[in-house]
UniProtKB/Swiss-Prot annotation:
Keywords: Cell cycle, Cell division, Chromosome partition, Cytoplasm, DNA integration, DNA recombination, DNA-binding. Site-specific tyrosine recombinase, which acts by catalyzing the cutting and rejoining of the recombining DNA molecules. The XerC-XerD complex is essential to convert dimers of the bacterial chromosome into monomers to permit their segregation at cell division. It also contributes to the segregational stability of plasmids. GO terms for cellular component: cytoplasm. Forms a cyclic heterotetrameric complex composed of two molecules of XerC and two molecules of XerD. It holds the Pfam family Phage_integrase. The keyword DNA-binding applies. Residues 116-298 form the Tyr recombinase domain. This is Tyrosine recombinase XerC. SUPFAM superfamilies: DNA breaking-rejoining enzymes. One of its GO terms (molecular function) is DNA binding. GO terms for biological process: cell division; chromosome segregation; DNA transposition. Belongs to the 'phage' integrase family. XerC subfamily.
C-alpha cells in the first residue's frame, strides 16, 4: 500500500516516461512494477508506510539490501539491473520535479549481466511450427491469426511487441513496413508477400471492426492480443510436436537472423533489419552460427581425425 502523495508522483512519472521520453507501454509497466517492488521493500525495511521523506533519505544499505533480496528471490541479473535502472529513473524524475539533490543511488553500479547467446530454431523446426500453428485456436479467424503472426515474426525478424503493434496503416505500403522499435528508433522492413497475404486473409474474417490506427492482432474478446496469450499457443505446439524447449515467439526473431546469416546475409544489413543500436549485439548471431557449423562438422564431416 502506498501513500496517496507518492502514488500521485508515480502517476506523473509514468506520464513523463510516455509523453516526454517516448518509452513504450511495456517498458513503463515493467518500470512501474520494479519501483513498486522497491517501495514495498522500503515499507518492510522501515516498518512503516513510506513517505516522500523516506524516499529522499534512503541510504546505500537499504538499496543494497533490496538488490540482495532480489538476488535471493532468483531474479536474473538482467531483471535486477532493469529494476535498479527503473528506480534510478524515478529518482532522476524527483530531481527534476522536487527539491531532491543528487542521491546516493546514482553511485550504485548494476550487476554484470551474463551474456547469453540467442537461441535459434533449426529450419526444420520452423517449418513444422509454421505448418501446424493453425491447429491451435478453435475458431478459424484465431487459427489464421496465429499463423499470420508467426509468419510475420519469422519473415520480418520483428520483436513480438513490434508485430503486435502492426495496424491497417502498415498494410497500405506494398513494399515495406515502417517499424518504431526500441528507443523510438525507426527502421524499414521489406514486406514478404506470404506474410502480407496471410494478414489480409485474417482481416477478411476477423469478426471485429478496427480503425486504421488500431493494432490488428486481437484476442478472442476483441481486445489487443497480449504476448503471453500467443506464447501459450506456442507452448501447446511445442509440447505436442516435441519441439525445442526454447521455442517462443522471440526465438523466431532469433531464427530469422541466424538463418539469414547462414545463407549469406552481411552483418550490417542484419543490424538494420533487427534494429540493433550496436553492431556488437548483432555479432552474437555469428557466434551461434559458428556453433551450428561446428555441430554440423562434428556429426557429418567424413574425416574427423
Amino acid at each position: 500500500m502506498l501513500d496517496t502523495s507518492i502514488q500521485a508522483l508515480i502517476n506523473k512519472w509514468q506520464k513523463y516516461l510516455v509523453l516526454q521520453r517516448n518509452y513504450s507501454n511495456h517498458t513503463v509497466i515493467s518500470y512501474n512494477n520494479d519501483l513498486k517492488h522497491f517501495l514495498e521493500f522500503m515499507n518492510y525495511y522501515n516498518s512503516e508506510l513510506v513517505t516522500i521523506n523516506h524516499i529522499k533519505t534512503a541510504d546505500i544499505r537499504l538499496i543494497r539490501s533490496w538488490l540482495a533480496k532480489r538476488n535471493c528471490d532468483n531474479f536474473t541479473a538482467s531483471s535486477i539491473s532493469r529494476g535498479l535502472s527503473a528506480v534510478k529513473n524515478f529518482y532522476r524524475f524527483l530531481e527534476k520535479t522536487t527539491q531532491l539533490n543528487s542521491h546516493i543511488i546514482f553511485s550504485i553500479k548494476s550487476p554484470k549481466k551474463t551474456k547469453l547467446l540467442p537461441k535459434a530454431l533449426s529450419e526444420d523446426d520452423v517449418v513444422i511450427s509454421l505448418e501446424h500453428i493453425e491447429e491451435y485456436g478453435n475458431v478459424k479467424w484465431v487459427e489464421l491469426r496465429n499463423k499470420a503472426l508467426l509468419v510475420l515474426i519469422y519473415a520480418s525478424g520483428l520483436r513480438i511487441s513490434e508485430a503486435l503493434s502492426i495496424t491497417k496503416l502498415h498494410l497500405q505500403n506494398l513494399e515495406f513496413i515502417r517499424i518504431i522499435g526500441k528507443g523510438s528508433k525507426e527502421r524499414i522492413i521489406p514486406w514478404l508477400p506470404i506474410a502480407k497475404n496471410l494478414i489480409t486473409q485474417y482481416l477478411e474474417i476477423l469478426p471485429y471492426k478496427l480503425g486504421d490506427n488500431e493494432p490488428i492482432f486481437r484476442g478472442k474478446q476483441g481486445k489487443e492480443l497480449q504476448p503471453s496469450v500467443f506464447n501459450r499457443e506456442l507452448i501447446k505446439l511445442k509440447h505436442f510436436y516435441g519441439l525445442p524447449q526454447h521455442l517462443t515467439a522471440h526465438s523466431f526473431r532469433h531464427s530469422f537472423a541466424s538463418h539469414l546469416l547462414e545463407h549469406g546475409a552481411d552483418l550490417r544489413s542484419l543490424q538494420e533489419l533487427l534494429g540493433h543500436k550496436s553492431l556488437s549485439t548483432t555479432q552474437n548471431y555469428t557466434k551461434t552460427s559458428i556453433k551450428h557449423l561446428e555441430a554440423v562438422y562434428t556429426t557429418a564431416y567424413p574425416i574427423k581425425k
